[in-house]
Amino acid sequence: MRVIIVGSGRVGAGMASQLAEEGHEVVILDTRTESFRRLAPGFSGQALRGDGTDTSVLERAGARECEWFFALTNGDNRNILAAQLAREHFGIPHVLCKINDPVRAKTYATLGIDTINRTEM
């Protein structure tokens, strides 16, 4: 399965490393190159420096062929924008958005975006 992950923080890097280890085709995006140091040694996926809310960056990451999209940065607004682009612009069938404010979950659900947050994990 082809996966794009936006955000190479603790959660994003951990998920990218695990999915790549399981044999999935993983592309992880982050605006800060140093964030990729969190990836497991020998990470077999692709790490791209870029903004996950930029359609040209998502295009370069292969969003048109992607099956799963995870927006896992530390910012709720950035995550929802990236998730909406994944769903609406690229038609990615499975989109998950990390949020820090659980009050936003209902709003995002009306947009067809599934969410996770720390308080529910």
Language-model segments: what does each one mean?
Residues 1-121:
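Cytosolic regulatory regions of ion transport systems
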